[in-house]
Every structure is written in structure tokens, then in C-alpha cells.
Amino acid sequence: MCPRNVDGKNIADYTFEEFKEKIFPVLKKEGVKFSSIGSPIGKVGIDDEEGFEKQKKQLAELVKIAKLTGCEYIRVFSFFYGDKNPKDCTEKVIARLKEMLKIVKGSGVKLLHENEKKVYGDVPERVLEIYNAINDEDFVLCFDASNYVQCDVNPKTAFDMLKDYVVYYHIKDCSKYKVEVPVGTGEGCYPYILGELKKRGYHGFMTLEPHTFKYAIFKPIV
């Protein structure tokens, strides 16, 4: 599983000691393992200095949690650009991601970048730009087709651009009206993407995201 919240609390709000004492024994007893840690790290404004400093401390704790649970990946984002032109944020985004990378270096844990609406890496061109600029084995990519639909990007185009660098997939779908829908009924191009992954012999993780029902529950499925 890929935990976002554990026992009613965001995974990033746990200290290592608290997680080790309260949560890990339950996971161990029930045989639950993490494919990645669904952290919100990087989901702050690019100019939010206080928020970034807080998240660096949280990331350090998450690295210890990841090692404890035998988890290889910590999901991260590339900062909200707000009202700015994303092109004006490039250097700062890459610099901050490199700061985050220093925190995981040598731990055996990798940063897993997810494309997300309104963060710098919300379109495949900028995701690839980030990936190439960082150019480190401990910075890898997670592909979310639905999030690309939310950004008016064709997921097939994004997949073809990034498929050689993606190690992890989030599975949810979205209609052309930006409404979350059952996988395979939206614009996520899943028949193509899954077919291509089968041809390529993909053996990595895929995470279903049932929490996204809340975005669609009061909207028509179209």
C-alpha cells in the first residue's frame, strides 16, 4: 500500500519514534508493507520558505520511516507555482528538489516525483526537464494519467515521452469534464498505457487511488 494518512493522521506528521512505537507494530502484526510513502512533500508554494523548511524536517523523518518499513520510495511534488509563470520558477524548483535529494542520499530511499495539477511538474515537458536537470538515480518518476487529464494533457502523449523513466504508476481515471470516473471509462488512455507496459514487461508498482471518490461523489459520472 501507499499510505497518505495513517490512523487519521497525515503520514508526514509522524515522527520516526511515534511511528515506530504506535504504527509499525500493527503493520508488522498484520503483514502490511508499503510500496511507497504517499507524502505531501513538495506540495507547498515555491516561495513558501517556512513551509519548505518544515517539509525538509518531515522528509528526514520519513526517510527513517521508509527504512524501518523496507519501503524504497517517498512520493514528492515539485512545488506550487501559484500566479507565477512556471518558467520563472525553474531554477528554484530544481534547487529545492536537489536539497530534498541530499536528505535521502545514502539511505537507499528514492524520491518519487508525481505529476500534479498546478505544481511545476504538472506537464510532461517540465517533468522531463526536472528529471534531466537532477539526473540522479535516487530521483525517479511516478506517472498519474488522471492528473495529466486535469492539466489538459493527453496521457498517451505524456506516457510516450516519459515511459523510459517512470518506475511507478498511480491508477485513477478522469473524464473530459475533469470528473473522477472508474478506471477505463475516462480519458486516461489506460488500454494503450497498460498494453504498452505489458509489451515492455513492466514489473513495478501500480497504486489504485480510491480516496479520489470524494472529488466525484456529488458530480454526475459522464
Protein language model features and the residues they cover:
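Structural motif corresponding to alpha-helix initiation and N-cap regions
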Residues: 13-21, 49-52, 56-60, 124, ...
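Short, solvent-exposed loop/turn segments at secondary-structure boundaries
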Residues: 11-15, 46-53, 85-89, 153-154, ...
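Active-site acidic/histidine proton-transfer and metal-coordination neighborhood
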Residues: 26, 44-141, 150
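Catalytic-core regions built around general acid/base machinery
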Residues: 17-30, 96-103, 158, 192-196
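Glycine-rich, proline-tolerant flexible connector loops at the mouths of alpha/beta enzymes
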Residues: 1-24, 28, 79-85, 178
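Hydrophobic residues within beta-strands of alpha/beta enzymes
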Residues: 1, 35-37, 74, 169, ...
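Histidine-acidic metal/acid-base catalytic patches
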Residues: 28, 70, 124-143, 147-222
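Active-site beta-loop-alpha junctions enriched in small/polar residues
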Residues: 3-6, 39-42, 79-81, 114-118, ...
